[in-house]
Amino acid sequence: MTFCDENNLDLIKKDLRYLKLLANQYPNISSASTEIVNLEAILNLPKSTEHFLSDIHGEYESFTHVLKNASGVIKRKIDDVFGNSLRDNEKLTLATVIYYPEQKLELIKQSEKDLSDWYKITLYRLIELCRVVSSKYTRSKVRKALPHDFAYIIEELLHEHDGTINKHEYYNGIVSTIIDIDRAPEFITAISKVIQRLVVDRLHIIGDIYDRGPGAEIIMEELMKHHSVDIQWGNHDILWMGAAAGSEACICNVLRISLRYANLNTIEDGYGINLLPLATFAMDVYENDPCNSFIPKTINKELTQNELNLISKMHKAIAIIQFKLQGQIIKNHPEFKMDDQLLLDKINYEKGTIDLDGHIYKLNDTFFPTVDPKDPYKLTENEDDLIKKLTRSFVNSEKLQRHIRFMYSKGSMYLVYNSNLLYHGCVPLNEDGTFKEITIDGVRYSGKSLLDKFDSLAREAFFFKNGSSAKRFALDMMWYLWCGPNSPEFGKLRMTTLERYFIDDKGTHIEYRNPYYKYRSNEKVVTNILKEFGLDPDCSHVINGHIPVKTKAGENPIKANGKLLVIDGGFCRAYQPETGIAGYTLIYNSYGLLLSSHEPFSSIRKAIEEEKDILSSTIILEQVVSRKRVADTDIGKELKKQIAELKMLLIAYRKGLIKEQDSKS
């Protein structure tokens, strides 16, 4: 609003009640004017950097490193600041100090002959680098990012200018004193963490924090400490959310996947869930069963034969319970249209065969001691008792509940942010590329409205009162989101879990994808998706995860003429031989979009000791002619609204509609 509008008082009078509330914060012309100047200045700052990660799958070491190196942003900043004035090995050491300050400093102490000199050089370099990465923020924002113990000192050093002789001596004196009083390691650690924090302003996690990796709970702890993060739920996240909410079918799936990959760290050590009842049950029921189809898939894990035997039996036990519980859900919800996954009643238990759509297949395992052929989906008394105990463990795990509450508070099915549409799986489509229409509770949904409905149901599953019919339905929908034919998280027509365990013919294992995956390279279809979510397709993108990009086979992560980007992080080691790389991440800064492809990460130990960073290749997707400013972002839109409201308040003061007050001290 401009001041030429002063004579038009209708809008101001209409909003007078709100403006009086605003006047409590800005009680006079002076304070309102100062805030307008401040906000206008912020609008002209460069847009801050966003970092996009996806499909972490519990691989906490790789995730931690990519988070610390910001997909190569810190190395690029070091190159920008120091150019050819530092050798490559010096740049590597400086980068490693920033990533892992405490651990790297311990090694430096053991190898460096003149430690004071090394401290001095490193401090100057870190201060110079921090000055550059903080330059796109207001002093107020930088101040909030500073650690309490060193806040004043770091702020002084960041705003020293070489042209001021007196200040230069003051600056040198601070650095020397830090070293003299043996506080250099603590200061280096503090300023390194400030650089880590400032180099990326917003972190987007596009799904699948959980899965087969050994440290999902460690990743969640890191995310809870992060200054600004959002999460778009993945199918594996939905499964854990359903389990934490009390869905027995989701709990069985979570346990089955963990046992399939012999990953019990997260279950037992991370969340304190007691698996002894499951182990006891499995050893009793499957004592003499080799459970050959349930031997866990281990990657870089050494297990004893006894451990393998026990895990295999637990694996089979929970899988059979899962098939029974899923069958009950399907029977209770004919509207799910999943009768093709009712398979226990298709087994001929005498002949050891199964009938799939009129085709008879031989089973590779015919030992089903807990299945009643006349009522195959009914739990035995012991199975029912077991699943109740396991459910209590999940819903009473304090740490799991805390993590999942965070997942809800920071997460959603999708996010529109700075002209980008972020989601993990897909927007369900028909064969002709139009939005798939699905009926839930008698109401038809498609496109954006469908994802909004699933988002609402996911929250009802966790937050609604236990025992209510609405909660029960929402819990069943969490399982549907995991494997249902029209789930935007699953993105396939059916899940062939039982077939993969019990039928050797791999033709029965195929899982056909939703037509979305055929059309996500089609610019017209992606344009329609962007419009559906209220975005301008000429300057917007879909950021997508879920399906690994098979770079090895020549697949390109850039689709639909650059309108859709696939950034499955490739953290999951099992996919890396298939994809050929360790996935993609995305950076969106004031200059444009940068897509990074990564080689597999070895270990944090090697990163510290041998300075082995992840090798990354960066593609510049879009480069703007003039740098994007805060004014061009979602935050900028909000600031402009605030400025307009403050200008209205100024007019109200000048017209005498609101009386000025003294500024509050």
Swiss-Prot record:
Q: What broad class of enzyme is this? A: hydrolase
Q: Which cofactor does it need?
A: Mn(2+)
Claim: Hydrolase is one of the keywords in the record: yes
Q: GO molecular function: any one?
A: fructose 1,6-bisphosphate 1-phosphatase activity
What is this protein's record name? Fructose-1,6-bisphosphatase class 3
Q: What is its EC number?
A: 3.1.3.11
Whether DNA damage counts among this entry's keywords is no
Pathway(s) per entry: Carbohydrate biosynthesis; gluconeogenesis
**Which InterPro entries does the record match to this protein?**
FBPtase_class3, Metallo-depent_PP-like
Q: Which Pfam families match?
A: FBPase_2
Alphabetized UniProt keyword annotations: Carbohydrate metabolism, Hydrolase, Manganese
- State the species of origin: Clostridium novyi (strain NT)
Q: Which family does it belong to?
A: Belongs to the FBPase class 3 family.
Organism superkingdom: Bacteria
Give an example GO biological process. Answer: gluconeogenesis
Enumerate the catalysed reactions.
beta-D-fructose 1,6-bisphosphate + H2O = beta-D-fructose 6-phosphate + phosphate
